[in-house]
Amino acid sequence: MEAFLASLVSVAFHGAALGMILYVISVGLSVTMGLMGFANLAHGVFAMAGGYVLTTAISRFGVPFPLALVLAFAFVAAASVVLERLLYSRLYAASDLEQVLFTIGLIFIAVAVARFIYGTLQQPVVLPDYLKGQFALLGRDFPAYRVFIIVFSGVMVGLLWFGVERTRWGAMVRATVDNRAMAQSVGIDTKRLFTLTFALGSGLAGLGGGLGAEIIAIQPSYPFENLVYFLVVVSVGGLGSLRGPFVAALLIGIADTACKYWLPQYGAFPIYVATIAILLWRPAGLFGRRA
């Protein structure tokens, strides 16, 4: 019984760490899809880019880990502004099929570029000494870096919630998600809002990709291998919501860890079955708005 409880705590802890990473990466996709109505399947490319920025900055240039996290966010956010202005903005009025084909094409290009520059091997993550080893908590030892992931991501969740719920920018985002035409009629510059929100969501994906590089391997196939997880978080949580993807990411992180620990022969199949069941029950997601 004691061994089972220990494994239960371990699964919950590691699942929570994975869930927090999935949330930091996916929440931007949820908000931008709810705000812009753009089917951006290339969101994982931004997470992969953040992972490469972090690992390259640390291993090749000796950048301290905290600064490397900042660089991952800033570089990806800046690159996303260029892509949004040059490419994405031209397809806002396009059909869903055209948007899907465009973003899948971006994935193929990003994968080819990553493979050309870095090869096919997983990028190693060099952690600072203070994030190595174990952290004692409630009489148990947990990996210090996983504890850091949970705490740091929790702070990011709080800051994001404050930004969306308690600032003028957040009020404009919520108004535009609810009714874009009405938001434009009262003077909200939706084009500029789209760019800023897209940059924030992409930057968070880059930050999550770098932060979670020790959990979700950074390699050229990253956008394809993890696309389903990001879409499941968004679809189960609901578009345009902060709370929904948070709950969905934690559930999926814990469920994925539990399946790999207790039912490795089934892989992620139980998660897909549960996702289908939830969407049949609530097509708009757990916290999404019904049409």
Question: Where on the chain are the PLM-derived regions?
Answer:
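Short, strongly hydrophobic alpha-helical membrane anchors
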Residues: 1-10, 136-138
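Single transmembrane alpha-helix segments in multi-pass membrane proteins
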Residues: 7-59, 82, 86-98, 234-242
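Hydrophobic core segments of alpha-helical transmembrane domains in multi-pass membrane transport
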Residues: 51-55, 73-79, 106-114, 152-161, ...
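Transmembrane helix-bundle core of multi-pass membrane transporters
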Residues: 61, 90-91, 95-166, 193, ...
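Transmembrane alpha-helical segments in multi-pass inner-membrane proteins
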Residues: 62-74, 195-275, 280
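Alpha-helical transmembrane segments within multi-pass membrane transporters and channels
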Residues: 62-107, 113, 247-252, 282-283
